[in-house]
């Protein structure tokens, strides 16, 4: 359940109290190029339509998200950042927002509401250290374990403390303590478990970067105090590498392995592994990827990443936001790149099956077309077509989106 804003306030007060102490006692480092203070303004209008054969009714939502705030660089190295956001329904409301009670319609998880988005105090006055306290986005690596779910109108944030250390050029270490997850369904959702999770989580992520790529090792220890049986620890390693064959051609690969086990009061069955292999080739701005991702499962428990930016994995139709107990194998092929007049395309094909038992979980085709224009504007057309076999029901989704970012 959501905690009060007391954590954010305590962290901000503590940071403001420590600021003059740090400025007085620390030797003055060479000042890095400072970002500018200024307003934050974003607006995104979206039409989303869902045809899910599990429902007699199709869903349609026309929503507008406005995010407004300010970044204040109040002394070299110190930043205060705060944004609030409002989400409004511009259409008929014929969809299940998760908060409006329209359960006869498919879910489009953009409930109307107004809330604080981010509110944090940051320090980066030393090129080797960075700290941040308060409500903030958390995006680790490719967002497979922790992300901001930026696709939804209300992004996911965390009440957290972050410390980053770069002891030498190729090395970086980041630690985060997470106190609360503020979910995409809104802080005032009538279901408190959709609004937020109280956490006692420790995240450690270390990287070694070279011209040819990067190696990352991580340990994520998450005690979900609202759903204690789901608590897990995940230990893993991720490799990304690339090699230029010529000025036009580049080959690359991403590979990852993680082991998940129960943590704190987590259930004994929370035991599974994760594997990813994703080779790719790039030519003059166009990229082709062929991937194989396995979220292990044994019929009782499937490898879980509940705080990930899940929409960008396993198909845009969002049929696998929760990993089945039998796990999931996703073999996919995709291409993306520029076309005429500034437009960019994306095409993806997925074939899904159970990790335990091998049942066919269907196929999915995803396509997108988008472009930016007039410096601050972008438009996006997007489509997902999931064809079911032994899991879920056939589902088609369409999005039309216009966005402004100052």
What spans do the regions from the language model cover?
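Beta-barrel outer-membrane channel/assembly domains of diderm bacteria
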Residues: 24-138, 161-167, 238-253, 258-262, ...
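Long, internal scaffold/assembly segments composed of regular secondary structure
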Residues: 210, 221-295
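Surface-exposed coil loops of outer-membrane beta-barrel proteins
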Residues: 93-118, 126-228, 233-237, 300-334, ...
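C-terminal outer-membrane beta-barrel translocator/porin domains of Gram-negative envelope proteins
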Residues: 83, 89-91, 106-107, 263-274, ...
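Aromatic/pi-system hotspot detector in well-structured domains
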Residues: 44-48, 120, 175, 202, ...
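Cleavable N-terminal export/targeting peptides
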Residues: 1-33
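Solvent-exposed loop/turn segments connecting transmembrane beta-strands
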Residues: 154-155, 196-198, 225-231, 261-269, ...
């Amino acid at each position: 359940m959501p905690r009060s804003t007391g954590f954010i306030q305590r962290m901000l007060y503590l940071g403001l109290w420590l600021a003059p102490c740090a400025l007085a006692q620390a030797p003055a480092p060479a000042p890095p190029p400072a970002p500018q203070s200024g307003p934050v303004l974003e607006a995104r209008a979206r039409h989303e339509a869902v045809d899910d054969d599990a429902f007699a009714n199709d869903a349609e939502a026309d929503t507008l998200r406005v995010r407004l705030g300010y970044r204040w660089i109040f002394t070299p190295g110190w930043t205060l950042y705060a944004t609030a956001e409002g989400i409004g329904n511009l259409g008929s409301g014929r969809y299940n927002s998760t908060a409006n009670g329209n359960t006869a319609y498919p879910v489009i998880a953009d409930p109307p509401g107004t809330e604080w988005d981010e509110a944090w105090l940051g320090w980066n006055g030393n090129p080797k250290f960075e700290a941040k306290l308060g409500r903030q986005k958390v995006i680790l690596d490719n967002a497979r374990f922790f992300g901001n779910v930026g696709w939804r109108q209300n992004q996911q944030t965390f009440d957290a403390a972050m410390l980053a250390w770069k002891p030498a050029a190729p090395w970086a270490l980041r630690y985060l303590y997470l106190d609360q997850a503020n979910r995409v369904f809104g802080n005032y959702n009538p279901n408190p478990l959709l609004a937020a999770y109280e956490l006692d989580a420790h995240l450690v992520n270390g990287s070694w970067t070279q011209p040819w790529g990067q190696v990352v090792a991580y340990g994520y220890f998450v005690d979900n105090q609202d759903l204690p049986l789901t608590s897990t620890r995940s230990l893993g390693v991720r490799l990304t590498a690339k090699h230029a064959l010529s000025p036009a051609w580049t080959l690359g690969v991403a590979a990852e392995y993680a082991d998940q086990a129960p943590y704190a009061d987590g259930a004994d069955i929370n035991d599974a592994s994760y594997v990813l292999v994703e080779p790719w080739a790039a030519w003059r701005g166009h990229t082709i990827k062929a991937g194989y991702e396995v979220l292990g499962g044994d019929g009782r428990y499937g490898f879980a990443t509940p705080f990930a930016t899940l929409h960008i994995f396993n198909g845009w139709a969002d049929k696998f936001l929760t990993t089945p107990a039998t796990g999931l194998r996703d073999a996919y092929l995709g291409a993306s790149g520029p076309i005429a007049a500034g437009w960019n395309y994306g095409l993806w094909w997925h074939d899904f099956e159970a990790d335990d038992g091998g049942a066919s979980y269907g196929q999915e085709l995803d396509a997108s077309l988008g472009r930016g224009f007039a410096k601050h504007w972008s438009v996006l057309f997007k489509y997902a077509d999931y064809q079911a076999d032994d899991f879920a029901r056939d589902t088609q989704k369409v999005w039309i989106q216009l966005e402004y970012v100052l």
